[in-house]
Amino acid sequence: MTATPKPLVLIILDGFGHSESPDYNAIYAAKKPVWDRLLATQPHGLISGSGMDVGLPDGQMGNSEVGHMNLGAGRVVYQDFTRVTKAIRDGEFFENPVIAGAVDKAVAADKAVHILGLLSPGGVHSHEDHLVAMAQMAARRGAGKIYLHAFLDGRDTPPKSAQPSLERLDATFAGLGKGRIASIIGRYFAMDRDNRWDRVQAAYELIVDGKAEFTADSSVAALEAAYARGESDEFVKATAVVPAGAEAVRVEDGDAVIFMNFRADRARELSRAFVEPAFNEFPRERAPQLAGFVMLTQYAASIPAPCAFPPEPLTNVLGEYLAKHGKTQLRIAETEKYAHVTFFFSGGREEPYEGEERILIPSPKVATYDLQPEMSAPEVTDRIVEAIEQQRYDVIVVNYANGDMVGHTGVFEAAVKAVECLDTCMGRIVEALDKVGGEALITADHGNVEQMEDESTGQAHTAHTCEPVPFVYVGKRKLSIREGGVLADVAPTMLTLMGLEQPAEMTGRSIVTLG
């Protein structure tokens, strides 16, 4: 048997979907000679990265966590979103022993239940249906004091779209006859993932101490005031909701705190501030002794708190299977997507496999990435080219964050520059592979940058899309690409190209047929 080409590089262009419409399509508008040449000369097709094809509800846009899980697992991974929704529908959620344990302990001592989470129908980090269910559960179990600390979205939803969600939760509490929204703050603060602890501190002090930049007598009034200050949902400053005659809510000893985000990466920092005894990223005036702090899912194994829906282990994901066959692999990304190309691609595993190396390139320290649309892509590419030339690795998995992170800003010109930068980077990788006889597969985890304006509202479109994503083979072999592929088919495709048998646990099907 002839040796398979080495290395095989999987290039994941984050947020790089395919749209037939040229309108507000940053990919269409960009000058991209390398991409155009690849599409003209190399086998390519489209694969699905949304909805049931990735284990999400029908019509639900994909996201980076889900995308990388499916890409690495080689099977459709039943997502936490669908697990929690199903548990609510089945009634199991309301008896969840971990949540019930914390709530019951607080109720027995006549203490409060605090619900934290992204209040949004976005379905990427959380879903407001889950927050409604949590409020109902607390009330059913006898909690007299139920407080929602609402983080506002505007990133996986239109920039100013929080009002219906706030009104829905106000109505939920009114219907229960108890509980209320206690505070609102933008996800920019509460859900940082880049160690910008000053942002997290603003959220922590709002929730725990009732310390706010602004106060309002209702959640909707708080939102209207934020809009009047020029803030969109994502950036709403710390606001305590204090109805007439009431005081700002604080978290007290003996209270229960339930964090209702199901996606881990943007829930970790705030969780650590609540539960780590030796936490020192910012000074905490108080660290209440809680009846319980519950993570909806496991945000990190190192966070000392129980989770309501523990991970369901995945065996024989691509990284593990390559290691079993003595293959070497490199994972590389900049900070913003490093967790995706390591933890999520490995099916929720923190530690590297035997023969796996990792390179983390710091993301630029700018307020928003439209200010530096190239991000750290050139530096990432430097290291990939070096790795290809060394021929030390059988497989290289790289994530380029630009399409997604710049797409989220809603700034069209910056998104075009991001695509043009990616094109240059791909050109360098293709050239390096050509020299050593390596191969690449280029795909994406979900769409974003191909739709930069919401036609129905005229607002910037900052969220992901349900568009299919490209799948391009780069190399010298003659092969054909089938239609109807999904992200879960990418790992089996890589095994086909490497001449490795597919493990039974991988239920995806190779997208390529050799010969």
From Swiss-Prot:
Catalytic activity, reaction form: (2R)-2-phosphoglycerate = (2R)-3-phosphoglycerate
Protein's UniProt keywords contain Coiled coil: no
Cofactor: Mn(2+)
Protein's pathway: Carbohydrate degradation; glycolysis; pyruvate from D-glyceraldehyde 3-phosphate: step 3/5
Active-site residue numbers: 64 (phosphoserine intermediate)
Binding site for substrate: 125, 155-156, 187, 193, 263-266, 337
Biological process terms in GO annotation: carbohydrate metabolic process; glucose catabolic process; glycolytic process
Family the UniProt entry places it in: Belongs to the BPG-independent phosphoglycerate mutase family.
Function: Catalyzes the interconversion of 2-phosphoglycerate and 3-phosphoglycerate.
Protein name: 2,3-bisphosphoglycerate-independent phosphoglycerate mutase
Source species taxonomy: Bacteria, Pseudomonadati, Pseudomonadota, Gammaproteobacteria, Pseudomonadales
Gene encoding the protein: gpmI
